[in-house]
C-alpha cells in the first residue's frame, strides 16, 4: 500500500505559517516565502541573543566610566583600584549603583582611589 503524505505535509506547512503570523504580505501566506522568512528570523534571533550580551556590557562600562569620571577617575584606573581593594562587584551592579545610588558609588570610587594611592 502506498503512503500518502498529505497530513504530515499539511502539518509542516501549518507549523511555518503559524510561526510567520504577523509578517507582511506573502511572507505570512505563501509557504515557501514564509519558511524562508521564519528561518531567517530565527537566525537573526540567534545573533541578537549574542549581541545583547555585548551591548549590555558596553552600556554598563559607559555608565561606570561616567560615574567614575565625576569623582576624577577613568574607567580603567577605577577597575584597577577595585581589584587592588579586593572589591568584587560585577559591572552590572556597579552600573546600577552609578545610576541609581550615586552616593554609594562615590564611596566605592573613594575606596578604589585609596587602594591606588597605597
From Swiss-Prot:
Q: Where is the signal peptide?
A: none
* Similarity section: Belongs to the bacterial ribosomal protein bL20 family.
InterPro entries the record matches:
Ribosomal_bL20, RIBOSOMAL_L20_CS, Ribosomal_protein_bL20_C
PANTHER family, per this entry? 39S RIBOSOMAL PROTEIN L20
- Family annotation (Pfam families): Ribosomal_L20
User: What SUPFAM superfamilies would the database entry show?
Assistant: Ribosomal protein L20
From which source organism is this entry?
Desulfovibrio desulfuricans (strain ATCC 27774 / DSM 6949 / MB)
Gene that encodes it: rplT
- Keyword hit for Metal-binding: no
**What are its GO biological-process terms?**
ribosomal large subunit assembly; translation
Q: Does the keyword rRNA-binding apply?
A: yes
Molecular function terms from GO: rRNA binding; structural constituent of ribosome
Keywords annotated in UniProt? Ribonucleoprotein, Ribosomal protein, RNA-binding, rRNA-binding
Instruction: Give the CC-aspect GO terms.
Output: ribonucleoprotein complex; ribosome
Q: What does this protein do?
A: Binds directly to 23S ribosomal RNA and is necessary for the in vitro assembly process of the 50S ribosomal subunit. It is not involved in the protein synthesizing functions of that subunit.
Source organism superkingdom: Bacteria
Q: What is this protein called?
A: Large ribosomal subunit protein bL20
